[in-house]
Regions:
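C-terminal soluble interaction/assembly domains
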Residues: 178-186, 190, 194-227
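Structured, acidic catalytic/metal-binding patches in enzyme active sites
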Residues: 1-173, 184, 218-234
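Compositionally biased, proline/threonine/alanine/serine-rich low-complexity intrinsically disordered stretches
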Residues: 230-258
Length: 258
């Protein structure tokens, strides 16, 4: 085990309340190293206020944040902080891994769609009907958030659809890269670290920390990412949200430490 080392897994919600990102910025300042995800050339730094992009995914995220009356992670998290460390694949290595695995973005999307349809068939309520009703609700943003939050409850199941039996570049290979960087940071003497990655990465990440770094879970904390109360729409209050509207932070410490 790595003596006196602690690693927090900070599960990112990419579109959330501005107050959520402000709280994360406060917490992030206390780490020796904060490892973050971004498929980009090694060492890339996100400019303050986020990088502007016309990429279809970026446009989709912008549309979602406007529809839900929320904010975007890259616009508010301070990636210029000195303790931030890029810990993800480069576009070239990401593409190479997908080719070697015989993967494609569309194949992953269809696999995810199949999982979603299977889950819908299990339930009594129609997601399509719920979404239509939410779109015509007098408080559309809040109604949509509540519908979507229910879908996030089975996040691990959704991610297993992406991963497949042999893992995937999107989750498995990127996690391996993040933990490679983690090992380098620990080797350089860092003791208090965090990995800030999408929530879907965390089940696999936690297993690898326990198996490869001999760490063990010690505690968890929830931070409000989406406020699902009625009053949240009027001034975005900081009231506690139901569990499904929160982002989870898990702490792992070296075996034997408190």
């Amino acid at each position: 085990a790595h003596k006196n080392v602690s690693v927090d897994l900070v599960a990112a919600v990419h579109i959330g309340e501005k107050s959520y990102y402000e709280e994360l910025n406060k917490q992030f300042s206390g780490y020796d190293a904060l490892l973050y995800e971004l498929v980009a050339p090694e060492g890339t730094r996100v400019p303050k206020g986020g990088a502007k992009s016309d990429h279809p995914v970026s446009r989709l995220q912008t549309g979602m944040k406007n529809l839900l009356d929320l904010d975007f992670q890259l616009d508010h998290v301070d990636y210029q902080s000195e303790n931030f460390v890029h810990a993800d694949m480069s576009p070239a290595s990401f593409s190479k891994s997908m080719n070697e695995r015989g993967e494609s973005i569309w194949a992953l999307v269809f696999r995810m769609l199949g999982q979603s349809l299977a889950e819908q068939n299990k339930g009594e309520k129609s997601l399509d009907a719920e979404l239509v009703l939410a779109l015509f609700d007098k408080n559309r943003a809040l109604a949509l958030k509540r519908v979507l939050a229910e879908q996030f409850e089975d996040l691990e199941g959704m991610m297993s659809a992406f991963n497949g039996p042999d893992g995937s570049t999107l989750i498995t290979e990127r996690n391996k890269r993040a933990l490679e960087v983690l090992g380098n940071e620990i080797g350089s003497g860092k003791k208090r670290l965090a990995i800030f990655y999408g929530a879907g990465h965390m089940p696999d990440m936690a297993r690898r920390l326990m198996a490869d770094f001999k760490l063990k879970p010690s505690s968890e904390r929830w931070v409000t990412a989406w406020d699902l109360h009625e009053r949240a729409a009027k001034g975005r209050s900081k009231a506690a949200a139901p569990k499904e509207g929160k982002s989870k932070r898990e702490k792992a410490t070296a075996a034997g430490n408190s």
